[in-house]
Amino acid sequence: MLNSRSELLDQFLRQQGIRNEAILAAIRELPRERFIPEALSHQAYQNNALPIGEGQTISQPYIVAKMTELLELTPTSNVLEVGTGSGYQTAVLAKLVEHVNSIERIKSLQWNAKRLLKQLDIYNVSTKHGDGWKGWESKGPFDAIIVTAAAESIPNDLLFQLKDNGHLVIPVGEESQQLLRIIRQGEEFFSEVIEEVRFVPLVAGELA
């Protein structure tokens, strides 16, 4: 049953234009039901965002795949994730690169994600309880930064923690949100709008 559900999801993602085989394989291999409340496990392989507690959600699989694809990762990419949440996006990234750095402002979510990743034998992740707006300077600079909550504006600290030719993928806006990809070239930053999205807000400075 799990195989058929993950295969249906794989087929859906391909229909939506996801082409990166490594990303598709990572999503096929990961048991998404482990990252959500047990009562919602019947929805694990549907293309839905689902609540995970603390007012937060796990993103729909299409958005996870799309944002990951936009990062243009290589196995040696130095990656920062802002918003660990359930740990699902973290786990997808960990299947693709040698090491992932992930920040979460809500301590209980960070702790639960860290424990779950270990249970799934995913050890190439460093997690931190902290303010994602500030990034993680000591681990940078980064080839890729992915933000899993919507910022009112683009945090400058994240921009300047990108390497030259580094990619930042971030939802921006309040009521209406756009998924942006920003690429650093020297001291300049080039932005493109990918699509309309809906995310929980990225809260600055306030740890929980």
UniProtKB/Swiss-Prot annotation:
Its main location: cytoplasm. The gene is pcm. Catalyzes the methyl esterification of L-isoaspartyl residues in peptides and proteins that result from spontaneous decomposition of normal L-aspartyl and L-asparaginyl residues. It plays a role in the repair and/or degradation of damaged proteins. GO terms for cellular component: cytoplasm. The lineage of its organism: Bacteria, Pseudomonadati, Pseudomonadota, Gammaproteobacteria, Vibrionales. It comes from the Bacteria. It catalyses: [protein]-L-isoaspartate + S-adenosyl-L-methionine = [protein]-L-isoaspartate alpha-methyl ester + S-adenosyl-L-homocysteine. The active site is at residue 59. Its EC number is 2.1.1.77. One of its GO terms (biological process) is protein repair. It is an enzyme of class 2 (transferase). Gene3D superfamilies: Vaccinia Virus protein VP39. One of its GO terms (molecular function) is protein-L-isoaspartate (D-aspartate) O-methyltransferase activity. It is found in: Cytoplasm. This is Protein-L-isoaspartate O-methyltransferase. Keywords: Cytoplasm, Methyltransferase, S-adenosyl-L-methionine, Transferase. Coiled coil: none annotated. SUPFAM superfamilies: S-adenosyl-L-methionine-dependent methyltransferases. Belongs to the methyltransferase superfamily. L-isoaspartyl/D-aspartyl protein methyltransferase family.
